[in-house]
């Protein structure tokens, strides 16, 4: 395994490497691998940017009609499950915490508010996730709190406030 190189963007192959546990080291945060990896690239990640100046992530998922979830959700009425977009936002907050150099396995801890106002259909081209970190705790507890937005082909279709993800060096109590 190569030493982790903190960059400002990542391509799909690098995200899959992260999912295989080969980016941040053994026992540390991983992204899911396909099919649960809900992003194709991180186009921008920053420790200081974003709406609150605490960090920002912009990531994308390319939509094609043959994505696995369109066949089963729902037959004859295909739509990407909203929970997959929500999970993508949690995935990105966990990635951010590890990208900053924090140890531990990522676990979603909740969200304050989630609102859906649109849908992702197989005719869409691209989903964009925009995460704005509000607070990053890096003590005995490592946790990120963020607001996130999901857009399809440039139109915002849902948001989540106060997404919470923690990194844990011991997950036995879960």
From Swiss-Prot:
InterPro entries: FabA (IPR010083), FabA_FabZ (IPR013114), HotDog_dom_sf (IPR029069). The active site is at 73. One of its GO terms (molecular function) is (3R)-hydroxyacyl-[acyl-carrier-protein] dehydratase activity. It catalyses: a (3R)-hydroxyacyl-[ACP] = a (2E)-enoyl-[ACP] + H2O; (3R)-hydroxydecanoyl-[ACP] = (2E)-decenoyl-[ACP] + H2O; (2E)-decenoyl-[ACP] = (3Z)-decenoyl-[ACP]. GO terms for biological process: unsaturated fatty acid biosynthetic process. SUPFAM superfamilies: Thioesterase/thiol ester dehydrase-isomerase. Necessary for the introduction of cis unsaturation into fatty acids. Catalyzes the dehydration of (3R)-3-hydroxydecanoyl-ACP to E-(2)-decenoyl-ACP and then its isomerization to Z-(3)-decenoyl-ACP. Can catalyze the dehydratase reaction for beta-hydroxyacyl-ACPs with saturated chain lengths up to 16:0, being most active on intermediate chain length. This is 3-hydroxydecanoyl-[acyl-carrier-protein] dehydratase. It comes from Saccharophagus degradans (strain 2-40 / ATCC 43961 / DSM 17024). The lineage of its organism: Bacteria, Pseudomonadati, Pseudomonadota, Gammaproteobacteria, Cellvibrionales.
């Amino acid at each position: 395994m190569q030493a982790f190189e903190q960059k400002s963007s990542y391509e799909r192959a690098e995200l899959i490497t992260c999912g295989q546990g080969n980016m941040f080291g053994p026992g540390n945060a991983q992204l899911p691998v396909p099919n649960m990896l809900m992003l194709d690239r991180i186009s921008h990640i920053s420790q200081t940017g974003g709406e609150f100046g605490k960090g920002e992530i912009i990531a994308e998922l390319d939509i094609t009609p043959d994505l696995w979830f369109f066949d089963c959700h729902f037959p004859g009425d295909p739509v990407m499950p909203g929970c997959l977009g929500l999970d993508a936002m949690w995935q990105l907050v966990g990635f951010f915490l590890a990208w900053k150099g924090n140890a531990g396995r990522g676990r979603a801890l909740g969200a304050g508010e989630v609102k859906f106002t649109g849908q992702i259909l197989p005719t869409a081209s691209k989903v964009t996730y925009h995460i704005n970190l509000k607070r990053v705790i890096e003590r005995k507890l490592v946790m990120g709190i963020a607001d996130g937005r999901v857009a399809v082909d440039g139109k915002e279709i849902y948001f989540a406030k106060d997404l919470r993800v923690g990194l844990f060096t011991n997950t036995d109590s879960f």
